[in-house]
């Protein structure tokens, strides 16, 4: 009988630990599709699943729940990922929580509603932010003066304003192109 207990004990603890998370690495060596990786994280949040953002761990990696749907979507989008066991996740989280490390695990719970302050006539390639969000497959809404003046900012969790609005970069652009026919035409529209 004692041998049976020993055998059961060995069998129980020799079974491989099942994976519980998908690690989306964000370091330059491991991830070829950084922007798409942000997109899959947003997509996961839209599915009302929580994500852990591992700040300063392998470039700010993400931990997503281990589901077949997420793995398939990562493959479709060309995103590098690693399936990790519970013990490996515990090891990573212990490292991150160490006071000697400049790292943090932040739980993301909701896909933010994103607005980009930009003229309506712009194409995604006219604006680096909208181009990145479009490529990453992160949904956003373009708003401009009319939406701001009619209190529609309340509909969004995140508003992106371009840095040139504050640094004078638009002034350089205006000085260079204010007399260009295409610029004059766009301003009239």
Regions found by a protein language model. Name each.
Residues 49, 79, 138:
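Short phosphate-binding/catalytic loops that engage adenosine nucleotides
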Residues 3-16:
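Sec-dependent N-terminal signal peptides
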Residues 77-110:
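Short N-terminal or domain-adjacent regulatory/targeting segments
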Residues 22-32, 63-72, 115, 119-189:
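Helical hinge/lid and interdomain linker segments adjacent to catalytic or ligand-binding clefts
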Residues 34-73:
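N-terminal, post-signal-peptide region of Sec/Tat-exported proteins
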Residues 14-15, 49-56, 103-107:
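Short, flexible, solvent-exposed loop/turn segments with mixed acidic/basic and small polar residues
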Residues 18-19, 107-114:
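A short, charged/proline- and glycine-enriched loop
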């Amino acid at each position: 009988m004692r041998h049976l207990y020993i055998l059961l004990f060995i069998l129980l603890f020799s079974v491989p630990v099942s994976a519980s998370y998908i690690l989306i690495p964000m370091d330059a060596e491991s991830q070829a599709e950084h922007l798409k990786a942000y997109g899959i994280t947003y997509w996961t949040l839209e599915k009302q699943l929580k994500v852990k953002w591992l700040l300063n761990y392998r470039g700010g990696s993400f931990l997503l729940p281990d589901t077949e749907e997420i793995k398939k979507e990562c493959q479709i989008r060309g995103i590098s990922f690693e399936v990790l066991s519970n013990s490996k996740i515990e090891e990573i989280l212990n490292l991150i929580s160490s006071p000697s490390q400049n790292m943090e695990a932040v739980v993301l719970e909701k896909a933010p509603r994103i607005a980009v302050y930009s003229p309506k006539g712009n194409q995604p390639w006219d604006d680096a932010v909208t181009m990145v969000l479009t490529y990453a497959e992160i949904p956003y809404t373009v708003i401009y003066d009319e939406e701001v003046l009619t209190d529609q900012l309340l509909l969004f969790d995140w508003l992106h304003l371009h840095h040139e609005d504050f640094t004078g970069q638009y002034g350089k652009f205006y000085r260079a192109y204010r007399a260009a026919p295409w610029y004059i035409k766009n301003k009239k529209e």
